[in-house]
Structure formats: C-alpha cells, structure tokens
Amino acid sequence: MGKITVITGGTSGIGRGIAEKILAESAKTDRIFVTYGHDEKKALSFQESLPEEKRSQVTLIKADMSYYEEMMVFVEELKKQTDHIDWLVSNAGISTYAKYEDYSFEEWTRIVNTNLSVPVFMVKELRSMMVEGGSVLFTGSYAGQQAYSSSLVYGVTKA
C-alpha cells in the first residue's frame, strides 16, 4: 500500500512545487491526487510536464474549492479511488486586490470560502481517511502576518 497525498490547488505556484517535490521522492506505489479549479489547460500542462514514468501516479480532479458542494463531490470521488490519506495539503487559494471599501459581499464570501471555510470542512470530511501519524498542511501567507490594504480579505484568511 503506497502513500497517498492530496493537494488542492496543486497545478501551479506553491501547490505545484509541493506536488513535484513529493512526486520526485515517491515510490512507484505512491499516488497524488491534485485538484484544479477552472483552468483545465493549465492542469493538463502540469501533468504533461511531469516525468513520463511518474505521470500515472498523479490523478487530476476538477473541484472549485469556493463551493462546499464541489468539495463534497471531490471528497466522494476521492473515497472511490483510495481508502486512506497520508498527507493532505490544503493549498487552493484566491485573492482579489482591492481596497476594503470596494469589496462586495459576494467577493468577500468567495475568498473566505476558498481560503478558509471549505478547506476546514474538507478536513472534517476526510478525517476518517487520515492514517495515524498522517499530516494536514494549510498553506498560509506572509499577508496573514503583515496587513496590506489591497488584499485585506486574503490576509484575514491566510493568517
């Protein structure tokens, strides 16, 4: 039984770097499940960039983490494909650069859902699949420690 890693938002940026590092050090029996939100072209480009002998270890799953319902569809799909998780990396995140007074309630809610609420409930849903000694990682940001007026809501969710 190989190690199972789940990475949300794993086709670009920090998530992609984590996926590539884990894959580089993985055994042939290990698997990585990577979510992507909207950009299927970028997701396929990520998969094609992987070493050919490792590509079959990576499963891409479309899931917009700003919606609880899509996260639940992802969780159900994951449960069909594996019986355990060793590492869960909650990396999906979004931001809008705007002044506080320019945020709409809908935009604020979308960012909070993507960066905080949905990931917390995803961990709750996947908790029973986590192996003893497994790890959950939430990626944060320096913006969570140092306030920026242009990305207030992002900073709040990444503290």
Language model regions located:
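Conserved glycine-rich cofactor-binding loop
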Residues: 11-12
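The beta1-alpha1 cofactor-binding region of Rossmann-like NAD(H)/NADP(H)-dependent oxidoreductases
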Residues: 40, 62-73, 105
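Conserved NAD(P)H cofactor-binding loop of Rossmann-fold oxidoreductase domains
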Residues: 91-96
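Active-site helix of classical SDR
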Residues: 123, 157
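Residue(s) in the substrate-gating loop at a strand-loop-helix junction
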Residues: 141
